[in-house]
Amino acid sequence: VSFEGLIQADSYWYSDDRTILSSDAVDGVDTDFGMRRAEIILKGKGPGMWNWVLGYDARSDKFLDANVQYKFNGETSITVGQYKQPNSLEELSSTKNNDFISKAMTTNMQGMSRRMGAKIETQKANWGATASYFGNEITNNESPSLGSGDGYGLRGYYAPMNSEGSILHLGLSYIDMEARTALDQSWARLRVRPDADQSNQRLIDTGDLKDADRLKTTGLEGGFVRGPFKLQAE
């Protein structure tokens, strides 16, 4: 059994030009200070080809990865429980590897994070593929559209260059899910904070799209690394 932890605090200074972005008047009208996350993660291996993980964020009061996995060999595995869904290279990347204080706005608005479900995944030296069927998140998600509703996801990637200091990554993903709110309403709504995850304001917000049926997202992703230079886009 191994133990991991991550504590992060953020400080924001805004230059407001449309609306007040601060979420806490005590911090000031153009600043926010506070604990961003306090993650505790337990991981275990065995017996045999079994693995498990249990993660919790005390700051957000929600479960993170919470699943068991069986590896058929060094390449193919089945996972049951809560895990990140197969979409968005940036969303799938660990928080500790983020390049900036916040993920890109398109990732935060459209990327699917953790849901309960089952997936099969294979990873070769230069390519990989994942298929997943999922339900709701363990902890109710504040996102009106991305925390509830059954669906499925597919993702594949190819890395013709994959060595230390030299990487070329190309990927394609697809998510198809029910448009459901936490109250089981058939609504959809996409919104995103302004590159500052502690702000309560959403500068991009579709509002409630009522009588919605499904949300379908197709993702294209690419990444290039050469020595100290990195380029990534989705």
Where are these regions (language model features)?
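Outer membrane beta-barrel
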Residues: 2-180
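Surface-exposed beta-loop-beta
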Residues: 148-234
